[in-house]
Structures are given as C-alpha cells and as structure tokens.
Amino acid sequence: NGMTSDAHSSSGKLLMDAANIPSLIAAPWLNYCDIDDETYQNTRDFALSDDNPYFYVGTYASGIGDPHDSISGLPNPHKEYPVVWPMSIAMQGLTSNDETEIDTCLDYLMDLTGGTYVMHEAVNANDPSEYSRDYFTWPCALFAELYMQRHFYQVT
C-alpha cells in the first residue's frame, strides 16, 4: 500500500508522483511522516520506479519528471524523451538515508546543469543542454540543502 495525492481518472485512480513540491516523495521533508514509515517507503519505491509514468531514465540521470514538461512538446508521459526535474532528484536525495543514493543524486544534479552550473526546471536526461528556465532558484536551494546535508552534517 502507498500514499495518494490525486485521483482524477475515470476509475478514480491515478498512479503517479510528479516532480513538483509538495509531492509524495517529499512527505518526510515536509514533516508529514517519518522517513522510515512503511507506507511512505512503499510510495517512494513506486515513485522511483518505471511503474510511475513520470519516472524517466536517461544517459545523464534518472528521476521524476512532470506532466507540465515544457521541453519536449510531446504528449506526456514520454519515456522515449526522458525529461527529469532537478528538484525531484534533490528531493530524492533529501529523503534518503543511503549515502550512495545521495551521492548519485548529487552527481546527477551536477551533470544536469547543461554547462551553466545552475539548476533548471526540467532537463533532458539524455542531453543536459536542453532545459527549461535558465536559472531556477527552487532546485538551486534544494541542491544546496542536499550538498550541505551530505558534506557538512551526518546523514542519519
């Protein structure tokens, strides 16, 4: 069993998590639940899997995208064109106790700047030079928090 955030389909079920915050993956960061909560962990496992239609795997990163992707111009979801949101990757790291996963998220984020060295709203995970918003402070702040947490505070 997992958490739900929205139910708009004709069946009353919409199985997904999107990149924006608040999101299901952000629940512990928002103090909604404990990071070790079983229901949350089931939800997190789903959100970070191919079962989530907005989870994308690319050459430079894997992560959650969003129905409001403004890069591809394709109908969503579009697994063949993996557009991830850096804020969701930062949130994945911020809601992890696994140092390897946190380091992977930091690496992904640094690889997704498209040579600008700042975070963007959405990025093509196969070609980081394709992105929306030249500079987006929200994921920049989340990246800074994740970096500080990993390198200056003990991850518990």
What kind of feature is each model-predicted range?
Residues N1-S88, S96:
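Extended ligand-binding clefts on enzyme/binding-domain cores
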